[in-house]
Amino acid sequence: MTRTKDEKGMEGLKGQIQKGKGVDIGTMFVKCAHKEGDEIVFKSQRNAFFEVEHTDFTKKILDNSKVKYIIKEDNLYVVGDEALQFANMFNKDTRRPLSKGVISPTEKEALPMIELLIKSVVGEPAHKGEIVYFSVPGEPLDAEFNVLYHIKMVEGFLKTLGYTPKPINEGHAIILSELAEEDFTGIGLSFGGGMVNVCLSFMSV
């Protein structure tokens, strides 16, 4: 049986620790971390966008300045850190693709914006199928919405980029990061811009 190139590549990874990446998709920021040698490298983008006038001149200026933007129909949207700069300059508010920790159901432009923001921080996978864990909030106690839609959309964005996405509760992620000496038993608290997440764990469960 002939093995494919991808199968041979993955076979070479067996017995090694697959480092992968971690992505925190928050209401305020989208952040990514991965390891290069002994160093952990972080990339961050503000989770926001701002609509500007769509003209050829504006597009040329943004291209020359390497500003991230999306053109949709007749509209041009600046995303990330630069969106806040534009909003401050025009004394207006930015718009956010997330609300209460999940993709906003009332923001019609949320999906293309969060997709571009995720792409800008995770980049290309080191190999096809590289694992990336992404944070998700728990089910809310004071609202009636399901996080499943949010999870499936983010999974789809990451799969399109060539990753193998795996969701992880953000409170649980803190426990796995900080409580190894306590056998991953304790309480993890995550204070975000849209929600506060609490996770109680006993021996990592």
Where do the language-model regions lie?
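Nucleotide/phosphate-binding catalytic cleft detector across ATP-hydrolyzing
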Residues: 1-191, 203-205
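Short, acidic (Asp/Glu-rich) active-site segment that either coordinates a divalent metal cofactor
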Residues: 197-200
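Coil-to-beta-strand transition motifs
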Residues: 193-195
